[in-house]
From Swiss-Prot:
InterPro entries: HCY_dom, HCY_dom_sf. Residues 1-101 form the Hcy-binding domain. SUPFAM superfamilies: Homocysteine S-methyltransferase. It comes from Saccharomyces cerevisiae (strain ATCC 204508 / S288c) (Baker's yeast). One of its GO terms (molecular function) is methyltransferase activity. GO terms for biological process: methylation. This is Putative uncharacterized protein YMR321C. It comes from the Eukaryota.
Amino acid sequence: MMDLGDKINPNLSFLGINCVSFNQSPDILESLHQALPNMALLAYPNSGEVYDTEKKIWLPNSDKLNSWDTVVKQYISSGARIIGGCCRTSPKDIQEISAAVKKYT
């Protein structure tokens, strides 16, 4: 039986998640790490804000479970080598990501 690792192109340098829920991203990345423990991973979650399609506005993430510090620590322990942000991440978010990367690497 072939596992997921046998199906990955050997020329692939990184695999990751992009524009996914801030709250769900650590679990998703950990699942990738479990399936591909030797693959370098990357994580670019969104800010967690939610777009209200009726009002056509972005709403703050009232269900944000963790800080960037906590999430970045989880990413690193799950094999992330590149960490950033996607939709609606702010310069403040990037500063927090950078500080956490420096703290945990």
